[in-house]
Amino acid sequence: MSTNNSVLVLKVGGALLQCEMGMARLMDTAAAMIANGQQVLMVHGGGCLVDEQLAANGMETVKLEGLRVTPPEQMPIIAGALAGTSNKILQGAATKAGIVSVGMCLADGNTVSAKIKDERLGLVGEVYPKDATYLKFILSQGWMPICSSIAMMDDGQMLNVNADQAATVLAKLVGGKLVLLSDVSGVLDGKGQLIPSLNGQQIADLVKQGVIEKGMKVKVEAALEVAQWMGQAVQVASWRDASQLVALAKGEAVGTQIQP
């Protein structure tokens, strides 16, 4: 068994939860990496499940600049959908693939500190790295943490955190390599073609042109932040593409490389 001291942080989007085959393929890839000594930390969203639960309760989904607005009355439903249902669906898929996993949220183990991000967004949190002890213990056992993006302030108030930003903070905390996996193969140009590599200036230009917008804008800016902080490229790739997952397992570059 080879050992790899770096942590691979895989952020998966909520759309994965609705694709059983995609989940199985990703977990099989993660299981192979863990068996080869690679430490893997998974961070997830669950936007589609949140939308479904809110609609079932007669509540509206509102977004501002790609971020979910979270009024206090929606927080229990959002926490249940993310830290509950979404987390356990992924944990079930991990168990099926033979992975020993630990379902958790950002509030566990004093892992991050959190505060309100912007009053206009309601109970949406900004999080900061705090203590890696809990995560490092789980990883040292050969287990895979599966972390939802629910955080908590010092007064116990739950906060909803954008999952891309949550993954960024955890990657910083454990000094890991970040891969943002979604249902698209990477960042696409105006013609729908994959862009293999982007730097900060190119990202700013594409945002200005409206090519990168909404959720992808949040994702790419989070990737750029961690790339600059860690001085290494962050990958934006797809869990749908089996060839990308195989390449990922081999440690090869996949999708779009966000350069520091």
Swiss-Prot record:
Enzyme class: transferase
Annotated metabolic or biological route of this protein: Amino-acid biosynthesis; L-arginine biosynthesis; N(2)-acetyl-L-ornithine from L-glutamate: step 2/4
One of the GO BP terms on file: L-arginine biosynthetic process
Keyword Mitochondrion carried by entry: no
One Pfam family here: AA_kinase
SUPFAM superfamilies: Carbamate kinase-like (SSF53633)
Localization per record: Cytoplasm
Task of the protein: Catalyzes the ATP-dependent phosphorylation of N-acetyl-L-glutamate.
Protein family according to the UniProt entry: Belongs to the acetylglutamate kinase family. ArgB subfamily.
Protein name stated in the entry: Acetylglutamate kinase
Lineage of origin: Bacteria, Pseudomonadati, Pseudomonadota, Gammaproteobacteria, Alteromonadales
Gene behind the chain: argB
